[in-house]
Amino acid sequence: MKEKILLGGYTKRVSKGVYSVLLDTKAAELSSLNEVAAVQNPTYITLDEKGHLYTCAADSNGGGIAAFDFDGETATHLGNVTTTGAPLCYVAVDEARQLVYGANYHLGEVRVYKIQANGSLRLTDTVKHTGSGPRPEQASSHVHYSDLTPDGRLVTCDLGTDEVTVYDVIGEGKLNIATIYRAEKGMGARHITFHPNGKIAYLVGELNSTIEVLSYNEEKGRFARLQTISTLPEDYHGANGVAAIRISSDGKFLYTSNRGHDSLTTYKVSPLGTKLETIGWTNTEGHIPRDFNFNKTEDYIIVAHQESDNLSLFLRDKKTGTLTLEQKDFYAPEITCVLPL
């Protein structure tokens, strides 16, 4: 069986925008790199249920988000919503409210867009974060993530301030702060993912290479720390920046990518999700594994390397969580986002 995977990334060198590849699950092989949409710096991409593709984007007006109608093969441009400044770094769809959320790293902003009848977008709210952290990379707010909690609130991660902010979403797309969780100073809060039970979350720190295991109180929208665990081996002392974090749909295994150590860390998750145990590290066979994702059956993990321009394919043992390399040299330039269809 062949599955399609969408890829987003930078367009600084050779990439033209969004691409697709095919995964042959029987042959354990990636093939057929094809251009889907020409867009500048689509570093994060997402789809809604109607087949609209939303990407981070830049144009002559500045940075923001681009909308496309995607038929499974090609994408028709519906328009950009951009403002002065750098593009977004994360986009997510809220199907229930028909909204799209965006995180702007450089401006320290959270943006909300309303999906129009044809799939195009209209900006409805912008929230500016303020503050800083102790590290040189934290001179100001850097919102790196904006997506939904299991109970339908919006949660953001701010790498610059080490804060995780939970918002209530009001009306046609206005944000009101519900709670703020303050992670360890200098962590560099980048992304967060939730256990399938909706009561536990895992916050990854780009700057200190750790994961904080958090309880989540749905009634109040409040996080509390349960555990902190490293993403690196004890004997590694080189540079590293953690990037992506994913949990299997059965809640048994968690994975993170390490840029510098150039590995995936595999964790065993306790039955209630409250504790992580490190299983080991897998060399990703490339440089700067910015993103990775499961295929739709979670039998495979596809890893994208931003600097070495290759995808690696790993077979995943669902019983043990361990990874076996199947392919490491598939060319895909400047990729920073992997999205299975």
Curated annotation (Swiss-Prot):
SUPFAM superfamilies: C-terminal (heme d1) domain of cytochrome cd1-nitrite reductase. It comes from the Bacteria. Disulfide bonds: none annotated. One of its GO terms (molecular function) is 6-phosphogluconolactonase activity. InterPro entries: Cycloisomerase_2 (IPR050282), Haem_d1_sf (IPR011048), Lactonase_7-beta_prop (IPR019405), WD40/YVTN_repeat-like_dom_sf (IPR015943). One of its GO terms (cellular component) is cytosol. Belongs to the cycloisomerase 2 family. This is Uncharacterized protein YwcC.
